[in-house]
């Protein structure tokens, strides 16, 4: 059976309260511990250092914050949320991190991507000279001559039609289009010029041959 505890002496209790609230004439309260005095001073200053990491609401006392989280945000897994917040803080401190955490947005925690260390050139249609000027010149340990180096002379390219031109284009065109050639004789000798007649003469001679 539990024994009776001795009654607290009011005189001894008042003596042990060594931490008194000063700076506020209307307040004469004293406390046994420094954290109790600090918590009391927040009532005068209106300071609320404890913030809810879910709804971002501030509280002056840690016990009020815990009570708020257990009653209002009872369906939220606080341990998982703390791990996500620690991972987000470590990622935000990493300069190479560019990831976002969409699962933290409902809780007011957003990780911004790291800025790009340099500006990339915009790919726009430009001449080769403009494209080369976007980049830094190459580094050479020895001084380069300022005058341009002459390139070896190259012959001009051949025209495309030089090897596609037909042979008959090199000859003069025939002016009389009515000239026909008679069939050759039984011998394989080439036809003589006398056997070549005009188309009009052959037409006139055809009725005489029938007579």
Swiss-Prot record:
Region (Disordered): 178-211
Domain of life: Eukaryota
Pfam families: zf-C2H2 (PF00096)
SMART domains, alphabetized: ZnF_C2H2
Keyword Metal-binding: yes
Induction: Under the control of the inducible GAL10 promoter.
PROSITE patterns: ZINC_FINGER_C2H2_1, ZINC_FINGER_C2H2_2
Protein name as catalogued: Probable transcription repressor protein RGM1
UniProt organism field: Saccharomyces cerevisiae (strain ATCC 204508 / S288c) (Baker's yeast)
Gene that specifies this protein: RGM1
């Amino acid at each position: 059976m539990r024994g009776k505890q001795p009654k607290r002496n009011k005189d001894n209790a008042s003596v042990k309260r060594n931490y008194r609230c000063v700076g506020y004439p209307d307040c004469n309260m004293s406390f046994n511990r420094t954290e109790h005095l600090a918590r009391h001073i927040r009532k005068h200053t209106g300071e609320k250092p404890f913030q809810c990491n879910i709804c971002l609401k501030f509280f002056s006392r840690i016990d009020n914050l815990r009570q708020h989280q257990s009653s209002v945000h009872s369906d939220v897994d606080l341990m998982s949320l703390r791990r996500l917040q620690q991972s987000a803080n470590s990622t935000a401190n990493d300069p190479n991190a560019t990831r976002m955490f969409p699962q933290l947005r409902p809780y007011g925690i957003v990780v911004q991507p790291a800025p790009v260390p340099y500006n990339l050139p915009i790919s726009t249609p430009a001449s080769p000279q403009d494209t080369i000027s976007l980049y830094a010149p190459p580094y050479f340990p020895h001084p380069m001559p300022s005058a341009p180096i002459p390139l070896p002379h190259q012959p001009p390219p051949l025209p495309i039609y030089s090897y596609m031109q037909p042979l008959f284009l090199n000859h003069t065109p025939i002016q009389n289009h009515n000239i026909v050639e008679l069939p050759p004789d039984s011998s394989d000798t080439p036809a003589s010029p006398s056997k070549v007649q005009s188309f009009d003469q052959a037409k006139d001679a055809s009725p005489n041959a029938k007579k």
